[in-house]
Each structure stands twice: as C-alpha cells, then as structure tokens.
C-alpha cells in the first residue's frame, strides 16, 4: 500500500530486482566474507537474534513465541545472497505444489545471477555449497516460562535437490514460513546496485540494509552499520570498512550522505537513495534532507554518552528500549 496515495502496489520480481523480506535485509543474515585466513576458519557459526522482526510472523503470534533466533553457517553476499535471490525468484515465478517448487537447473542458475556460459562443473561448484549453507541455517521459535519451554525448529530452506543430467532443481520450504517468503512488509530490491558492486561484499550488505529503511530515514549510527556487517576485526578496522563501503555506494550513484557527529556518536545522514543508479525525472521526489548540524552537548550529557559508549549501548539500543515499553 502506497501510504501517500492509498494505492495498492504489487511488487513483482524480475531479472533486475527481487522482492526481499525486510527482516532478512535488516538482520545480519547475509554478511561479507571474513577475509583473513585466521577469521575465515573459526567462528564461522553465525547466531542472530531475530526476535524483533520475526515475532510478527503468524506462526509466532499463534503459538505465543517470544524469542526467535537464526543460527547456522555464515552466509556471504557474493554467492549465498545471490542463491537466496534465486530461491525467492523460483517460488515467485513457478507453480508451488504443496511445499515444493521445481524448475530447470539452468534457469535456476540464471536466477542466481550466474552466466549460462559457465560450465556445468563451475555451476555446481557455486550453487551446491550455497544451497548447503542456506539449508543448514536454522530458525528457532521459542517461549519459556517458569516451568516449561516450547520451541519450533525449522530451516530457511527445508531441502534442495538438483540433477544436472535431468536439468532439474527441486526446492522445499516449510509451509509455516511461506509468510517469510511473501512477507507483507516488503521492498523491491534492485539488483542493479548489487551487480555494480561485484566482490565488494561490505557495500552489498550495507546496500541491502539501507534499501530496507523507510523513506527519509533517520540518521544511521556507525555502530549500527558495524553490527550489520558482523565483522570480527578490531573496531577501528571495522569503521574503515564501513566508511569505504559507504563511499563505494556513493561512487556507483546509489546514494549521497554526510557523516556527522552528535556528542560521541557518529552518524550517517542519507540525502537520497537511487536503486536504479540514476536520477529520477523529478529529483524533488527524492526529498533530500540537509545534514543536521552537530548539536552542542552539555558536559553532563557528554559524560553520560561516554558512559553509554563504554557499556556498548548505542542510541539504536535506547530507541528499541523505549519502543518496547
């Protein structure tokens, strides 16, 4: 629903865009590859608290689940995200029989953004590991009281089968999670920006997060962007990675921004977003906002902000706390 006009807007995936559930875009489910050999071979199990986003699913509401966690192998942007895009496209474009969808293997590879010119062996080498990682990603819904615990455990994809000789792919989803595939809070994610950011996974990950935000988003803290990338390097190095990724997003024409500081908190003010990487016919529709001037902070407030930073508490954390009350 377009809030400004009241018009119902249907979002349909094609080769240039995909409809992505907002929850998976905001959460750190798909993240950059850990570059260093030391980091790439340890701590590869990712654990994400998805309570705030996924307790809105009818499954969670019906059963009274109040905690949702996503656990599994670290899913990267360069291969795993594109395979997930292929899965979303497959369920959107083909007839779903029961809880399964079947399509030609070559077509599935194209939906994953893999050129058809690649050999069958190279296709398998790219798709097979990604399908294993995605199918190995567990989503658990639970509720615990003083005496008892209830928990429902499922997977991002229940099963995947392919046969290159017969040229088929079969994908099976949990029917109770179909709502996740067709979440009512969707945005249309343009793949043009993803394709323009080949091998720049940090920029790709920040793109999926920023594109999920509402129109005229509030300033985003540097700490929130660090959390979205879920890197293991020192904070100083992570800050450099975030700034480099933001600059890469500006270079391809996706956005413009200003980095400001309020107290001890560094923020990014987004002036506009252009997922098609070109200016609209009417640039006034972008409603660019001037950067907010840095506010003067009293010594008492500066001291409180410094204490919060030492405790690892961000402004985003405080905002969530007040919203939950």
UniProtKB/Swiss-Prot annotation:
Is-annotated flag, keyword Metal-binding? no
Pfam families in UniProt? Rep3_N
Region annotation (Disordered) maps to 279-298
Q: Which UniProt keywords apply?
A: DNA replication, DNA-binding, Plasmid, Plasmid copy control
What GO molecular function annotation could you give as one example from this UniProt entry? Answer: DNA binding
Q: Which Gene3D superfamilies match?
A: Winged helix-like DNA-binding domain superfamily/Winged helix DNA-binding domain (1.10.10.10)
The record's comment on protein family reads: Belongs to the initiator RepB protein family.
**Functional note:** This protein is essential for plasmid replication; it is involved in copy control functions. In vitro, binds to the DNA repeat units, BCDD'D'', EFG and HIJ.
Q: What is this protein called?
A: RepFIB replication protein A
**Taxonomic placement:** Bacteria, Pseudomonadati, Pseudomonadota, Gammaproteobacteria, Enterobacterales
């Amino acid at each position: 629903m377009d809030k400004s006009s009241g018009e119902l807007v249907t979002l349909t995936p094609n080769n240039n865009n995909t409809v992505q559930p907002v929850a998976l875009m905001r959460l750190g489910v798909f993240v950059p590859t850990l570059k260093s050999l030391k980091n790439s071979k340890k701590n590869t199990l990712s654990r994400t608290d998805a309570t705030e986003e996924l307790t809105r699913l009818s499954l969670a509401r019906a059963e009274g689940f109040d905690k949702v966690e996503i656990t599994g192998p670290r899913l990267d942007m360069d291969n795993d995200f594109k395979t997930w895009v292929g899965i979303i496209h497959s369920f959107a474009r083909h007839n779903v029989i029961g809880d399964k969808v079947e399509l030609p293997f070559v077509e599935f590879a194209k939906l994953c953004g893999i050129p058809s010119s690649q050999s069958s062996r190279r296709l398998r080498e790219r798709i097979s590991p990604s399908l294993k990682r995605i199918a190995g990603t567990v989503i658990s819904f639970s509720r615990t009281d003083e005496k008892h615990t209830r928990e429902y455990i499922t997977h991002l994809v229940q099963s995947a089968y392919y046969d290159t000789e017969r040229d088929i792919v079969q994908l099976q989803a949990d029917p109770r999670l179909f709502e996740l595939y067709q979440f009512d809070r969707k945005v249309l994610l343009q793949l043009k920006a993803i394709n323009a950011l080949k091998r720049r996974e940090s920029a790709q990950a920040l793109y999926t997060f920023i594109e999920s935000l509402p129109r005229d988003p509030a300033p985003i803290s540097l700490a929130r962007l660090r959390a979205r990338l879920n890197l293991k390097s020192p904070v100083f190095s992570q800050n450099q990675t975030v700034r480099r990724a933001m600059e890469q997003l500006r270079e391809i024409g996706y956005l413009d921004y200003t980095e400001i500081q309020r107290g001890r908190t560094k923020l990014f003010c987004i002036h506009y977003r252009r997922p098609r990487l070109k200016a609209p016919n009417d640039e006034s529709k972008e409603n660019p906002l001037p950067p907010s001037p840095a506010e003067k902070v009293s010594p008492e407030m500066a001291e409180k902000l410094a204490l919060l930073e030492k405790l690892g508490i961000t402004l985003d954390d405080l905002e969530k706390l007040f919203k939950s009350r």
